[in-house]
């Protein structure tokens, strides 16, 4: 999800073919390296923010008009428990997920007077590659 030009063009391409979008589910995320913030590589920090936050902002900009063309549009964004808890060593990932949640909540409030249903989903512990990367000793 860090192909910003592709994301920006996505809305137009969907419009050309279908004119609307009924549902969006955004699950794009990368973990980055867990560790002290002062040890986090700048490029990796920015990459995590770009994938987990900035790409979703661009996606919202690209597809909101398409969602509004639908009868009962829905947009859901997957988040994480670390978005709501301050945990050491989770740096860019936690920051990006907390920021994503705030952005989605703001977008939801901005669309309160229309029929666009916007939600944040926290799936909890899920046996994924990212979960195994973050918790290598955990039994899944």
Feature annotation, model-predicted:
Residues 1-5:
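Rossmann-fold cofactor-recognition segment
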Residues 17-18, 31, 35, 62-71:
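A short helix-coil junction within the Rossmann-fold of NAD(P)-dependent oxidoreductases
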Residues 29-30, 68, 72-99, 104-113, ...:
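Catalytic loop of short-chain dehydrogenase/reductase
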Residues 35-37, 41-49:
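Substrate-binding pocket helix/loop in short-chain dehydrogenase/reductase
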Residues 40, 86-90, 131:
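Active-site "substrate specificity/gating" loop of NAD(P)-dependent dehydrogenases
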Residues 60-61, 105:
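A short, exposed helix-loop element centered on a Lys and neighboring polar residues
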Residues 123-133:
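Short, flexible catalytic-loop segment of classical short-chain dehydrogenase/reductase
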């Amino acid at each position: 999800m860090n192909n910003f030009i592709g994301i920006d063009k996505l809305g137009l391409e969907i419009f050309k073919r279908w004119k609307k979008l009924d549902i969006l589910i955004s699950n794009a995320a990368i973990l980055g390296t867990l560790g002290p913030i002062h040890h986090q590589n700048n490029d990796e920090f920015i990459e995590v923010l770009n994938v987990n936050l900035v790409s979703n902002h661009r996606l919202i900009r690209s597809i909101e008009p398409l969602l509004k063309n639908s009868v009962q549009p829905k947009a859901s964004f997957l988040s994480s428990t670390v978005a709501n808890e301050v945990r050491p060593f989770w740096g860019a990932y936690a920051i990006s997920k907390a920021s994503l949640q705030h952005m989605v909540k703001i977008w939801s409030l901005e669309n309160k007077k229309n029929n666009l249903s916007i939600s944040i989903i926290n799936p909890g512990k899920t046996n994924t590659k990212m979960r195994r990367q973050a918790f290598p000793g955990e039994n899944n």
